[in-house]
Amino acid sequence: MSAEQGDPHRLAALAALASAGILAVLSIDIVLSQFPRGLIVLACLVLALAAAWYGLTRTGGARLLGSGIAILVVAVTVAVLIADGDHLAQALVIVASLGLMVLATRSAFRIHVPLQWAPDPRHPVLFYNLKSGGGKAEKFHLADEARARGIEPIELKLGADLEQLVRGAVADGADALAMAGGDGSQAVIAKVAAEQDLPYACIPAGTRNHFALDLGIDRDDVVGALDAFVGGRERRVDLAEVNGRVFVNNVSIGLYAEAVQREGYREAKLRTILDTLPEVLGPEGKGLDLRWTGPGGHEHSSGAAILVSNNRYRLGHAVGSGTRPRIDDELLGITVASAPVAGRGLFQRPWREWSAPAFEVDADGSIAAGIDGEAVTLDTPLRFRILPAALRVRIAAAHPGASPSAAMPEGARETALALARISMGRTPKPQHRQRKEH
């Protein structure tokens, strides 16, 4: 990384540390000068969270009651702050400082990783779905842009078998494969590319493009992603599979998977998930008939949701949450979420997570699941395993080449120390691989 790149990191780190200092001073001042009002405001926020959770996990009148109480308590809290104009201004400064701290921290740890040079392929092929991502392939004229770069475009038409198309292209001499579409389609291309040891490029023309983000591809530069096959760089990443089916991101079981299975999910995603919540997490919920073994070898039969991912996700953090720092740790990420248990307090951590090269989930019948966002039903037991360094990924030289959270430390203390080092001129570097089960 060049010295020129280090200056923006240093400025961002200084801004993050300054914002954190302002945030701490003002927060302490409000609590001390407004005692006991500050504690009352905090209690109101806790009550609002509890009421909101109660409403989400119920149906009918109980849901309306919980939601109504939460809204009322928040309104009272805002009214209390407005009644004191001076402290309202302080509260607004706190919110602004918090936002600046998060944005500056994200910028301070954003890195560009130089990857290994690789020769351009002679016959690269791009598969694209015109409907994916609201029509991004058509909007950005990807077929024409591909031809201009010597890449053969093949449109995925309605009802076509994508895997059959890909294998046909390989048989006809394709020596590199790219996909412009959603993550489910990316997994199909990646599977064939890994089997044939061919270079693969992920073109972010889907709806969310989670795989592209964690690979270090600029999701806003859809056309530029085609340069992966023109002066691009290469890295190897892991894939994962469940019962022989390859996935690039994750497999979800439980709440999200139940919602994805429902007829109205694609038209009203949030509403469908909210309607599913009481059935999975509520007091009258049917729960999940799942059996799995934890990292200590103990058998379990509970959990509101299970997420098995191709490498570990960063969860529960203000910055970088929902991304994977690496996709080459050679380990599955396993997260089991549970409904809150009475007597353990409101702020109990609602999930447990660990990493392992393999994982198994069993049940008495088949299991509804979401594989890279696509609804499926799987026969049990579900056997997951990581496929280490299975995929040769090509990435445009101008793109970051690393996940947004690749250099992000774990924990507030480690983050503060790292920001201090960056502010003194040190450049952020990717975190080390795990390389062990924990």
Which stretches of residues belong to each language-model region?
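ATP/NTP phosphate-donor binding region
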Residues: M1-L177, A187, P400, P409-E410, ...
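Catalytic phosphate-donor-binding core of small-molecule kinases
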Residues: L47-Y54, G68-I71, G232-R235, L277-L288, ...
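Catalytic core of DAGKc-family lipid kinases
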Residues: A118-P119, V125-G133, A137-R149, L156-K157, ...
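Short glycine/serine/threonine-rich phosphate/pyrophosphate-binding segments
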Residues: G184-V188, H210-F211
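Glycine-rich phosphate/pyrophosphate-binding beta-alpha loops
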Residues: S252, Y256, L307-T323, A375
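Gly/Ser/Thr-rich active-site loops/lids in small-molecule metabolic enzymes
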Residues: Y265-I273, R314-P340
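Short, solvent-exposed S/T- and G/P-enriched segments that are highly enriched in secreted/extracellular
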Residues: L378-R383
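Catalytic core of tubulin tyrosine ligase-like
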Residues: A389
